[in-house]
Amino acid sequence: MSSRIQQARLVARRRVAEKTDEFVFAISNPQANQPSHSMGTSASACELRFRPGQFISINVGTDGDGNPILRSYSIASPPERRGELSLILRLVEGGVGSRFFDGLRSGDAISFTGPMGFFVNELSHAGDIVYVATGTGIAPILPMIEEVLRRNEPGRVLLFWGLRREADLFGQDELAALSARHPRFACHVYLSQPQGFYRLRGRVIGPVLELLPSLREPTFYLCGNGQMIEELKAALIDRGVSRKRQIRSEAFFD
């Protein structure tokens, strides 16, 4: 983990879904840094070296005693986008972090530490890989999926993504392109409160458990709502899945 305070400047912001924005930052400081895991060679100037799934901790203000308020955000962009990083945030009314980000303008700087975190892909997988996300928990999952699809591994790569309504959807073109390029990848998007007709209705937990008997040596990566993670994790363990060897998770709180 890099504990050194670094800076980046906002270069783009776009609305991707209802109350959900993508923020793109250019790394400002030219010093090389090392990721939280050993990853080989040093970074070159203005690069942020990280593994898909890791996060950064951002100073979003100060409390009443003048102490910094820190919030953690997963990196949504792949490492190949050298010199920049993107974050996908659901803006929550009254949230300290949301208020900070909503006030950012092009060229504004943020201070952060990282990258850090252990919610990353295993170095290899013998069987199927199942990613389960809710809401903006998809942010670190997408680059993780891209990483494993570049490997010559035998198993299927499956994504189950749960959202509330159609207005919460984003990234459909990217997911469709991944499906078209990689026959072993399949994406299933479920809406729990669709406003109109939608084929895949309900929460993601049930469909994942229904699929479990057909999976071969699966590894599960769970990211998003903490309640979903705990419920699904408990159900998987009850069905013989190893918590230590087969389940990785990262809780998000919108």
Q: Model-found features: residue ranges?
A:
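Short, conserved phosphate/pyrophosphate- and ester-handling motifs at nucleotide-, phospho-/glycolipid
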Residues: G53, G137, N225
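Phosphate- and divalent-cation-binding pockets in alpha/beta enzyme and binding domains
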Residues: V120, P140-P143, E231-L232
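Conserved S-adenosyl-L-methionine
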Residues: A126, E147-V157
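Ferredoxin-reductase
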Residues: S2-S106
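A short, basic/flexible loop-to-alpha-helix module at the beginning of a structural domain
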Residues: G114-H125
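Reductase modules of NAD(P)H-dependent flavoproteins
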Residues: S2-R4, F160-D254
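Histidine-anchored nucleotide/phosphate-binding helix
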Residues: I138-R150
